[in-house]
Amino acid sequence: MNSTALLDAPATASNGHHAVKTPSRLLGLKCKECGAKYEIAPKHVCELCFGPLEVAYDYDEIARLTSRERITRGPYSMWRYQDFLPVEGEPQVNLEAGFTPLLKCDNLARLLGLRELYIKNDTANPTWSFKDRVVSTALSRAKEFGFTTAACASTGNLANSVAAHAARAGMDCYVFIPSDLEIGKVLNSLVYNPKVVAVEGNYDQVNRLCAEIADRVNRNADGVHENRWAFVNVNLRPFYSEGSKTLAYEVAEQLGWKAPDHVVAPIASGSMLTKIYKGFGEWMDLGLIDRKVVKMSGAQADGCSPVAQAFREKQDFVAPVRPNTIAKSLAIGNPADGIYAKDIAEKTGGAIDSVSDEEIIEGIKLLAQTEGVFTETAGGVTIATLKKLVEAGKIGKDETTVAYITGIGLKTQEAIADHVGKPMQIRPNLASFEEAWGRKF
């Protein structure tokens, strides 16, 4: 069938996608660049200007539906916020992700000289990263569209999450990864028995390949579109990315229905930071929390810092780079939402900075040794950048600050293996322990 742009679109467009009936709180898809509007469908690029599409909501309808009381009666997962997510019915692919701890970090705050510091600890998700939020959203929507195969391009955590959720949903699964990925992340995908395809190239090359496959595999012999493979971060990207808004909703609720003053989040594609910003904004617009400017700061590794570079040099574009960093989950050299993340940081008075691999390792150790949380390299980037921004005076001492920790360190043990102590080797007797300890009881 020909799906048409919504009636009030600035221009019309047609495509071969099968669109489902639009729920009353969803208006459709809208281009972030030219504003063209489309029906709800598995579509991610504007036909008129090739800009990215995102979900548009009927906020009057959401305001009628939602309230603090309705939210608090919901499940203790990300799905307590379903009124704000692009899924029509009950979530069909659900591992109970979300509602992870907001941990008050008094020890780290004292060391950095901050009055009030929290981490949003998304290592507590089902596959130990924030990706469970976006995957649950995307694949629940994919089931509504009638897709039977789940797929993704991934730097690791997304592959783990897609494989797990596909197993839960009874969907076939293909995950495409760079061939140099950490072994922990590869094993954490293989256990769910997906088809894992290791591509000899970096993430950006893997992503381009997946875009080609998505276009080819979802057309029949006559060239007509059919919903076969749901690439969560390609043809399902507008729905997938909305799941990150729950990172804002949870923080606001856990802080007592208020937004923080400042957040620091890692930047890979840039999508997460933009959606955290959108989430706070939606709740302010609907009166669920008081209006304020939340300073949005981003963190990158020096070896893959195109957004930080654009921020520092005040560029109106993000120049692609070739990644070379231990923070492989952030190694996206051509970030799709990088320019939007940069603009948000500038608009809110935040900052985007980058740190060296050595600082990343120290960031991992600092969080572990002060607050007992073992983060992967992306979290090391976040903590090291947090420290750098505080020392530069870009985060105020009295600002309530939240740092987003997006994945667990068990997946990236290689990064720190040579930078921590070794076990004491002793014989099984007290004298041997006293000798190794250097003291006697």
In which residue ranges do the predicted regions lie?
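PLP-dependent amino-acid enzyme catalytic core
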Residues: 2-441
